[in-house]
Amino acid sequence: PLMMDDLDLLSTPVNYISYRVRSLDKKQHDVQMYVETTPQLAINELTQPTRSKVIRRNGINYVQAGTIDQPILGRKGDGICIDWGYAYLAGNIGANTAVSLGNYYGMKNEFATKGTLLPTQAECVTRRADQMPAMAYTDNLGKVGADGKSGFLMLGYDDISAIEYFYQPRMAYWKHDGKVTIFDAFERAKANYASVMERCRVYDQMILNDAEKAGGKEYSELCALAYRQVIAAHKLFKDADGNLLFFSKENNSNGCINTVDLTYPSAPLFLAYNPELQKGMMTSIF
């Protein structure tokens, strides 16, 4: 969820994956949902050793994955991926939902043939790309008719330190200088799912309405497409003096950060919906 009027929510690195299924032929169908990822989310090179493990905590099952070395803020430049911090696949603990860590091919085969996951490994250490395990989630929705059934899981990333600013490592805004953990963030996301999704629907409609008034229906659709792209690849944090900073990061253009050629074209969105974010872009320039 990326609502610019809620800085905690904007900066929290927890995503919802929502799903809903319904029968189109008016018959009942037996349905199981399967989602997976791998530790590749948390590495820069396929040869990097990784450690993954299953965590069960406060009503949520997690599969956590990250590099063994954890070179925090150790890379810079273009064409690179984060290889510090931890990726998380998370789902509610329930009678019909499960997460599992296990063999990449075996996990899919188990689901395809039986509709279930392999019994989970508690921990998995890899040294090569071909050892990468599956981090899997399933929801046994049972018999599904025309009325449908729905659910959600969560995917998140704790980068530990978000940015080095004038030789000081800084945490992301949502951490509030270490007072909030990634598990706090997941638990809050789980508890607030329904209300946050409703807020997102209202916010989406506001963006569409405002843009249509300004430039017509096609313009509003373009703005809806651009909204997440404009906000993506930014880090929201505070400096040592408590100033709010909101920096963009170029992924494949010299590896620069907070460059004005990105700040200028993105400015209208932030000026319209949260000028504090625009100030966060400009503070370090002036």
Predicted regions and their residues:
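Short helix/strand-bridging catalytic loops that position acidic/His residues to coordinate divalent metals
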Residues: 2-3, 266
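Acidic/polar, glycine-enriched structural segments that form the non-catalytic walls/loops
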Residues: 3-9, 20-258, 275, 279
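Short, solvent-exposed loop/turn segments enriched in Ser/Thr/Gly
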Residues: 11-16
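Carboxylate/His-rich catalytic cores and anion/metal-binding grooves
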Residues: 263-286
